């Protein structure tokens, strides 16, 4: 059966799952630098490409040049990322910081939003944002933090993307400020519809209202969605 075309589709702001979006959802597929370009994507399937902090030890200046080339090559690429900082992984933190700073500059130069992987480095990230003063918006994906952490990030102008595990008060704070997105990340059996259903119950609003608001936010946060066809 062909899925019903929704006026306000689900938006999966960050996914590593290979399936393409259908009539019910827009998907932002997160690709690493060495993964294939998304020329085959059509309709509601888009991509982000970035230098993940786990890869920082093997990155070079040439990696930055290749990243810029890939970001420019396809209009289906709507964001840079995932970039980020991770104090738990074994990659030297100094290299993570260097390449993250360079990705921030690149995102600003190309007018692309930045999708961020963040593990135990929130204070560093907040300081960097204050120092670098980027004009492109920053979205932290897979946010599971407490309301106090969410409040600090929201005060600093971040957007937060939530998966199947989230703190209900943190989601409510971000949603109330128009800075929440939802995602499936790397869980292939998880549907974006189920994440929306859980979030709508937590927020005490209808599924339709949630879809409408997050869809409108996505068109603003990811402006290349509009350049690729307007209303999906």
PLM regions: where:
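Mid-domain alpha/beta scaffold segments of enzyme catalytic cores
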Residues: 1-232
């Amino acid at each position: 059966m062909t899925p019903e075309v929704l006026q306000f589709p689900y938006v999966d702001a960050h996914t590593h799952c290979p399936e393409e979006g259908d009539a019910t959802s827009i998907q932002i597929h997160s690709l690493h630098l060495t993964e294939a370009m998304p020329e085959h994507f059509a309709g509601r399937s888009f991509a982000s490409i970035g230098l993940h902090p786990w890869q920082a030890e093997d990155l070079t200046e040439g990696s930055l040049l290749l990243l810029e080339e890939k970001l420019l090559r396809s209009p289906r690429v709507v964001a840079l990322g995932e970039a980020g900082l991770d104090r738990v992984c074994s990659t030297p933190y100094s290299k993570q910081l260097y390449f993250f700073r360079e990705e921030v500059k690149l995102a600003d130069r190309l007018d692309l939003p930045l999708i961020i992987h963040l593990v135990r480095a929130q204070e560093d990230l907040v300081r960097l944002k204050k120092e670098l003063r980027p004009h492109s918006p920053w979205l932290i994906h897979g946010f599971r933090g407490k309301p106090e952490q969410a409040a600090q990030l929201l005060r600093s102008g971040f957007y937060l993307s939530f998966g199947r595990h989230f703190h209900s008060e943190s989601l409510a704070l971000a949603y109330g400020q128009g800075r929440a997105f939802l995602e499936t990340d790397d869980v292939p059996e998880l549907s974006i519809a189920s994440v929306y259903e859980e979030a709508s119950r937590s927020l005490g609003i209808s599924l339709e209202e949630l879809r409408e608001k997050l869809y409108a936010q996505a068109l603003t946060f990811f402006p290349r969605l509009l350049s690729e066809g307007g209303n999906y």
